[in-house]
Amino acid sequence: MTISPGANIAGRVIIGDRTYVGMGAIVLDSLTVGRGAVIAAGSVVTRDVPDHVQVMGAPARVTRERVEGR
């Protein structure tokens, strides 16, 4: 898991392996971020993030599915 500077993880968030949280991203309380997920810089995550997807925006939406291992 990589959490960039300025990212804000609020409360009890479960973050999976091989996950990247971009600079200035906000992940709200009581959410799960799946394995291999990427949260783009400045995104606001308001709901659970599935495994192997990229999310971005405010509120964050899935913008692409990622192939495991890439």
Regions found by a protein language model. Give the residues of each.
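A glycine/serine/threonine-rich, flexible loop-to-helix segment
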Residues: 52, 67-70
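Structural signal for interior beta-strand "rungs" in well-ordered beta-sheet cores
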Residues: 1-56, 61-63
